[in-house]
Amino acid sequence: MRSYVHSLAAYIYFALFIAATGVYFSVICMSYGYTDYSQYVFSNSTILYIVIVPILTMRLFAEEKKQRTDQLLYTSPIRPGSIVLGKYLASVTLLAMSMLVSLIEAGVLSMFGSVSWKTVLTGCLGYFLLGACLMAVGMFVSSITDNQMIAAALSFAVVLFCMLLPNISNVVPGRARYTYLVCVLAVLLVAWFFYDETKNMKIAAGVGIAGIAVIGVLSKVKPALFDNGLSKIIDWFSVLDRFNDFCSGILNASSIVYYVSFIAVFLFLTMQGIEKRRWN
């Protein structure tokens, strides 16, 4: 957290967030009298993450690797999990602090009309969880490169891709064979991950064969699952689609579990990468 205070990253983030939400708040809510803060401010402000996430995460690990100070982390008695969680919590703390600005704006809006605080708080939670997911991705990207500019560019590309997923799902081919192909490639990727972690070809081959066998059985038993399968897969993985429920005031437990699981996966991947470099 101290590194954020002594750098421009936190100040740039707060300036961008306050400026963007302030514009949407004043132009849409105050000028036109719309009191649905979540729909008009939070929904439109998601585009900010394309810039905010790279700014806040690019230095988390990349800068330390460049300056060779990461060796101090690898040789210290502190566990990799504690290092990753500490850095991650520092970045999401800034995100949580910015939510206070949104609540202040919603409070001002309530003085001029009827504001549904349930929708505001639900939208605030959704906006925070969406940002927390993208922060976890950005931190993982920062951990795999030693150049913060490259980390920023990769984070920008990944976040932009996440934002475009709902549009991509509308243009992907709907034929079942494309779904089979993507599923098989995903299984092979998982098998490669097991081999990379265990260096055991038998385990990796077993995972790959079992996964492909499951795909084959499902294609025979429930072939309808693979019709427009790519769109279904993309929609399921889309972090932005789930955020829309929060903006509508819908507190969906499955969406919360999805976001938390998404965060946990990328924190785990970051921890594994650090642990691997620590032993190497």
Q: Where do the PLM segments sit?
A:
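Residues that define the loop-to-transmembrane-helix transition and helix capping
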Residues: Y11, G81, Q148-M149, S254
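Hydrophobic alpha-helical transmembrane segments
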Residues: M1-T75, Y88, S98-I104, C133, F193-T198, ...
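Transmembrane helix-loop junction
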Residues: S3, E63, T75, G107-M111, ...
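Transmembrane helix segments
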Residues: Y24-V27, Q148-D245
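Alpha-helix N-cap/helix-start motif at helix boundaries, enriched for small hydrophobics
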Residues: G81-L85, V141, I274
